[in-house]
Regions:
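Sequence/structural signature of beta-propeller modules
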Residues: 2-47, 325
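Residue-level detector of Asp-centered blade-edge/turn motifs that repeat once per structural unit
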Residues: 72-75, 114-117, 161-164, 207-210, ...
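A generic tandem-repeat structural signature
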Residues: 96-175
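Gly/Pro-rich loop segments of beta-rich domains
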Residues: 33-68, 79, 95-108, 139-155, ...
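Blade-level signature of beta-propeller repeat domains, shared across WD40, Kelch, NHL, RCC1
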Residues: 295-327
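Short loop/turn segments immediately following the C-termini of beta-strands
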Residues: 83, 125, 164, 172-173, ...
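Conserved beta-propeller blade signature
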Residues: 77-79, 119-121, 166-168, 212-214, ...
Length: 327
């Protein structure tokens, strides 16, 4: 089940530095691992292995407290919505770490996206708003929030971009996905597109290269695919713990092959589907202490084919690599 926003332990307080800038951490964070998992035996299924573990529990740079959202920029830098530390962390491929935000600027950030110009989009569940920042952390604009008169979000939890730099927000408690242009102008709402397809607390959204929109219809335990015109044309998954089944799915990502990755949060795993909904991978299949996931809430893909998983209640990020295909 989705467990919400875990509180910080009594002996730990969030980062208090309210300066809105990047702060560099000396040394390197990322540590490669060699654990192999998610081996698959079914026909045409692919397998992925754990290649790297990033971060641990805490409030220092390079540590996480309930990482909920992740994104990768064109330079393969990783961005993590470090929710209970009220910040975004940027981690370079070399392992350098930078922090953006603090409790005076961000309140429980849930989703993060980065465009081709390295502008950063953050949705804050705690403030019911979306903020846009420049590549160096400078404020650009915000939408929503407690004083907003027109834009009203209710627990926005995920955000993604399309090839036109439109951004899509999973506006969870409004049971919709809403779309804005890069300049912050409203473009379109996707809410209960048909009587048969009515969203219930959607907590993930992704757009593929063809403009099709994938919505994690979380409390209906499925993913709904919409055409570029917003018409539902496929339902992926069904409720349950089995292969290809979903329990409260959250984050979504499209990989290099056009495959759909789903953070199957309630089943403590991630799964890959083809664009048409055929399940082809599950991680982990045989959990070990190194590979076990705890309510993962987000997934992202980089330009080399690696998959990143926000292991939310494990307070870390895992990087997965392909281990090949078994027929």
């Amino acid at each position: 089940m989705v467990r919400g926003n875990p509180a910080l332990p009594p002996n730990m307080s969030p980062v208090t530095d309210s300066r809105f800038q990047y702060l560099e951490l000396g040394g390197k964070l990322r540590r490669p691992t060699v654990v192999t998992a998610a081996e698959s035996t079914a026909a045409r299924r692919v397998s992925f292995r754990l290649a790297e573990t990033i971060g641990s529990f805490g409030s220092q740079l390079g540590q996480f407290s309930a990482p909920v959202g992740i994104a990768v920029d064109p330079d393969d830098c990783l961005y993590v919505a470090d929710s209970c530390n009220h910040r975004i962390q940027k981690i370079t491929p070399e392992g350098d770490v930078y922090g953006l935000g603090g409790p005076d600027w961000l309140l429980h950030p849930q989703g993060v996206a980065v465009d081709g110009a390295r502008f950063i989009y953050v949705c804050e569940q705690g403030a019911n708003r979306v903020q846009k920042f420049g590549p160096n952390g400078q404020f650009v604009y915000r939408l929503g929030g407690p004083l907003a008169s027109q834009v009203r979000f209710a627990s926005p939890t995920a955000i993604c971009l399309d090839s036109y730099h439109h951004f899509y927000i999973a506006d969870t408690d409004n049971d919709r996905v809403t779309c804005y242009t890069a300049t912050g102008l409203w473009y379109m709402d996707y809410a209960s597109p048909t009587k048969e397809i009515a969203f219930s607390r959607p907590q993930g959204v992704a757009v593929d290269l063809e403009g099709r929109i994938y919505v994690a219809d979380t409390m209906h335990h499925r993913v709904v695919r919409l055409s570029a015109q917003g018409k539902p044309d496929a339902v992926i998954g069904r409720p349950g713990p089995g292969f290809g089944e979903l329990t409260e799915p959250c984050g979504l990502a499209i990989d290099l092959d056009g495959g759909l990755w789903v953070a199957d949060t309630g089943n403590d795993r991630v799964q890959k589907f083809t664009a048409d909904g055929e399940a082809v991978c599950c991680f982990p299949q045989a959990p070990t202490p190194e590979t076990e996931l705890h309510a993962p809430r987000a997934v992202a893909a980089d330009s080399a084919g690696s998959i990143y998983v926000a292991d939310t209640l494990g307070h870390r990020v895992l990087r997965l690599q392909s281990a090949g295909m078994e027929w």
